[in-house]
């Protein structure tokens, strides 16, 4: 296994709330620094261990773009979830809900209890899979679902008419209908954008990987909110991934060395969320 890159650690003895803020600042600096260094070194690096097999069908990867003469996106976002260290605390869910002004039942990232091979259980966070071939995009009657060049699948709630066709098409059950107006919060009233959507009544909402944060080098709320460092935000172009505590890994090596898998990969949606499994864990049925 490729060891995480060493970075400044949070000083010991700080109050929990202060330590959390310091950790998030260090993580943000880490993401900005590593993205900048990696991008300057090689904008057309091999983007992941599985691209040899998928280059012909994934036009938003750096290799495929180079082969076709297309402009290479600066980033190709993905997520890595290390289930070996997930304790099911659901802080990822709560951090997301707080950031996006969601109600308790609106779980854009949901933690499932799964059964392992020994009959025990383990926790599995499930965000939007950010599919390279998203079924939800094809069925929307008004074009409210879009996919950016950097691989983010977003919803324009100003266009969405709430047909729920996208919900039926999503094999991951990662979309939610907004039955009520969003609760009052500090970010309201604010205009809704695909990068920072407002969960307006009568529309469909979903995880957007905190798309408004990424250009500033900030971590998604679920990543920074996870106390166990389970969630990594990764970039297939620069080939790095960073978690909340600030650990940085070479993405392709991290995936390869830990035999990363993708949920329901057999469906051909090419999800950009990778799971690292512990002993006896499998992405099968719920417990």
Segment roles from a protein language model:
Residues 33-48, 58-79, 85, 90-98, ...:
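A structural preference for long, well-packed, hydrophobic secondary-structure segments
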Residues 1-26:
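N-terminal secretory signal peptides
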Residues 19-30, 40-66, 280-281, 287:
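N-terminal twin-arginine translocation
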Residues 78-100, 120-144, 154-174, 199-225, ...:
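Cysteine-centered iron-sulfur cluster-binding motifs in ferredoxin-type domains/subunits
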Residues 215-287:
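Long, compositionally biased charged/polar accessory segments in the mid-to-C-terminal portions
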Residues 55-68, 97-125, 146-159, 174-203, ...:
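Non-heme iron-sulfur electron-transfer modules
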Residues 19-32, 51-55, 86, 92, ...:
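Twin-arginine (Tat) signal peptide motif
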